[in-house]
Amino acid sequence: MGFWSNLKDKLFGTKEERIAKKQAKIEAKEQRQLEKELIKKNKLNTYIAGLSKSNSSFNEHIKELQNKHNKIDEEFFEDLEEMLIMSDISIKLVQIIINECKKEVRNENITDPKLINEIIADKLFTIYTSNSVVDTTLNIKDNRLNVILVVGVNGSGKTTSISKIAKKLIDEGKKVLIAAGDTFRAAAVEQLEIWAKRVGADIVTPNENEVDPAAVVYRAIDIAKSKKYDILIVDTAGRLQNKVNLMNELAKINRVLASKIPDAPHESLLVLDATTGQNGVIQARVFKESTPLTGIILTKMDGTSKGGIVLTIKDEIGLFVKYIGLGEKVDDLAEFDLDSYIYGLTKGINE
């Protein structure tokens, strides 16, 4: 073996070692790709399972429609319109979907009702993404205390949603503190404490006789700053009976946050129960008037057969769903993915 061969072996290893290293790199890359594909598959399976009721209802109604009609005509579109409204899609959106379907049917000269399935799925997708970029990420940055304000009525799944988001952030290596700002319900504070302990988050609760949510938030900010937390998640009261009180409470919390942390809150998320349908849209309007909102957490999607509420919220409230509840387990609160949602909702209609 010559000098240069020896020198190369010293610097870069023997030929066999170089081949082994190269093979190891290839295997590591393949492993990473496999892990990515597995995560994607698991996410899709979560959507399919969580949307099974909506999917079953959607498929059933589409097939009923196709069995009833031999051709695509005005009567067919009237029945399709009724079906989409029954799926909790707003009347305004349904009219847009119907008009778009009519255009495509006319342009492609389609007469068989069985050929319209893919068109419907495509229109659901394009309407959701029209005039805006779908953004489901949380506004979280390094080297600052990130504040997430969470609002919603009692019983919407607010407590569990806060805990599940905390768990996701903790799993990402973030240090998370929860402020129990629903001071009007002792049971809500106790439940949040139990969940915080379960997911490994710290929590600030009201002191004895402390009924002002803003005071709890004030203390929580000081603790979060002094102990270098990455995330502060603020729970709030969910009383809609008195809109003026609700607006005043949220306004005061927002003032406290802004005075202590520039640009806070960085996220203001509204928790809505998907099973409430159009009532959820009414709730969203009230909360939007009470505090600036950045996104929606849509819970209990696994419990409804009307999956169209996602589209209605975006159209009528102008907010994207950032998280969607697809089951009771901690990992069943998923970051909203439009592709997986449309697939989970319409899976099987072309089979």
Swiss-Prot record:
Annotated EC: 3.6.5.4
CDD domains xrefs: FtsY (cd17874)
Sequence positions that bind GTP: 152-159, 235-239, 299-302
Reactions listed under catalytic activity: GTP + H2O = GDP + phosphate + H(+)
InterPro entries: AAA+_ATPase (IPR003593), P-loop_NTPase (IPR027417), Signal_recog_particl_SRP54_hlx (IPR013822), SR_rcpt_FtsY (IPR004390), SRP/SRP_N (IPR036225), SRP54_GTPase_dom (IPR000897), SRP54_N_sf (IPR042101)
Protein's cellular compartments: Cell membrane; Cytoplasm
GO MF, any single term: signal recognition particle binding
Membrane topology of this protein: Peripheral membrane protein
Single GO BP term: SRP-dependent cotranslational protein targeting to membrane
Record's subunit section: Part of the signal recognition particle protein translocation system, which is composed of SRP and FtsY.
Function: Involved in targeting and insertion of nascent membrane proteins into the cytoplasmic membrane. Acts as a receptor for the complex formed by the signal recognition particle (SRP) and the ribosome-nascent chain (RNC).
Protein name from the UniProt record: Signal recognition particle receptor FtsY
The organism of origin for this protein: Metamycoplasma hominis (strain ATCC 23114 / DSM 25592 / NBRC 14850 / NCTC 10111 / PG21) (Mycoplasma hominis)
This protein's encoding gene: ftsY
